[in-house]
Amino acid sequence: TTINPSDDAPAEEKPIEELVTNAAFNSKTATGTSDYEFRFTANCDGVLSIWDSEDNAIATDVAVAANTVVKPATTTLNVGKNSFRYVFTPDAGYIPEKDMVMSSYEPIEGTFTVTYRTYGVEGQSIYVAPGKYGVGTKEDPMSIYDAVKYVQPGQTIVVMEGTYYLDKTVKVERGVNGTADKPIQMVADTDASSRPVFDFQGLCAGMVLAGDYWYFQGFDVTNSANAQKGIQLSGKYNTMDNIMTYHNGNTGLQVSRYLTTDEFDMWPAYNLILNCTSYGNADAGYEDADGFAAKLTVGDGNVFDGCISYNNADDGWDLFAKVQSGSIGAVTIKNSVAYGNGYLEDGTDAGNGNGFKLGGDSMSGKHVLENCVAFDNKAKGIDSNSCPDIKIKNSTSIDNESYNVALYTKTAENTDYEATGIISYRTGFDSDTVARTAGLNVKEDLEPKGTQDIKKIYKTTNYFWDTASKTSVNSEGATVSTDWFKSLDYSAILDGVKSVGTITRNADGTIALGDVFALTDKAPAGVGADFSHDKLTASVSPVIGESVATGDTSNIAFLLALFLMSGAAIAAVCIYDRKRRIVK
């Protein structure tokens, strides 16, 4: 049947969707410093005004842009609870998207409370212990939850030994910062005989660390809830030193942004993850749990140095980026080892299992992999994962089940890979010393595109696996021989069910690979990874100040001030009374 268009029913207009109006403070609610900066976000444009408890204006009609963190004012806090009142008024004409309006343009009124409290002074140490709720002295330690709220720049949180059975996330809120000269330390008790363990009992995310200039050292994080990370590092200029993350419900230690509204300038940057180990992390679906990750929302200057990642459900390292959030900052991984990923410790066949996965969505990253070893991973050893411009220096990739080295992209028109000193090798044996003929027939995946200078990939210092000759060959036809290595027997590291064996650490935290994959004088200079002790970065021995002596010193200061004021008032009354008598 043919219908004349003039007889059609009138076109229906697309319904207008309403977006619920949201506005809230996202600055810290507890602090150990009196100087305070407000942070506020809303999902629409508008203006914000703030008043203190005595109705003194702190901020008046400060412009707020939608989905942007605004810093409307600073103030000086009083000891104890500080209450503030605010009014946010949405712009009446604000349209969030086409065919969409805000659910309400009426002013939003609310209150916001910040607690200011101090324990001790700069240079002193606050002690925490399992199940304790004291005042932070060594004899009467406090909870880890209170310590991370009220610690001051230049102080140390000393984590006493034992297992901390925790039921909520340990969160260092944004704004709880040290400084470059006065960092905040959170370190294991150097007098203890065992490492402290934060066990989250499968109930929640582990630690979310959004402060700047912190130094974390010497503790373990385990058993976060399914799909929740062990540690999320979201601040800047922090160091994670000798931290172990294992058996968490998602990635062991991940660098990524704190809030979904954070733009690139707020993404975590210039953090050092030093001599840390991450293993056995697995989500229920075996899809997301990596050992380490710096992905999706990562700023510049983040470095992994001296880390070990093994037997994680997904990848050893994941530097994934995607088009929706854009490129991430360049990440450096050096002096590190990835093995056995994609299999759990009991041999369970889990997720993807790449050793070092260095990109995503064909986004530029310029990530650097230097002096690293990847072996016996379920999938690829070194994987660009479509990133078109990674740099690999002096690294060894051995006996990975898929490609030892994969440099490829998908949608990028040009690549700019740089590779120097690569040894890709296959022993022909798996961890059970059974011939692995399939592995010998897995070539590299090297796919330069467009303007790529192939001399940056194929050169005399790079030895890639050749399936025809069953050996590793450089650009001039020279080959790798077994006498280049002191040992290719890593069976002492892996047992029959792929659990950890004997990768140990030296007393200073550096990796002790021993003779495994170490090169002899038969190998040419400038190739492969070198884990000689002098090439590695040692951990730092923390300086722990004296214990805080009196607990909440802010209350003491307040009482002292009242005492002095009272004394002055009494003295004034006495003087007045004396003068009155003299006059009489």
Protein language model annotation of sequence segments:
Residues 123-166:
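Acidic Gly/Asp/Thr-rich repetitive segments characteristic of extracellular carbohydrate-active
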Residues 177-229, 282:
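Right-handed parallel beta-helix/beta-spiral solenoid domain characteristic of secreted/periplasmic
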Residues 27, 55, 412-543:
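Acidic, glycine- and Ser/Thr-rich low-complexity intrinsically disordered tracts
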Residues 129, 160, 173, 187-189, ...:
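Feature marks extracellular polysaccharide-active and adherence modules
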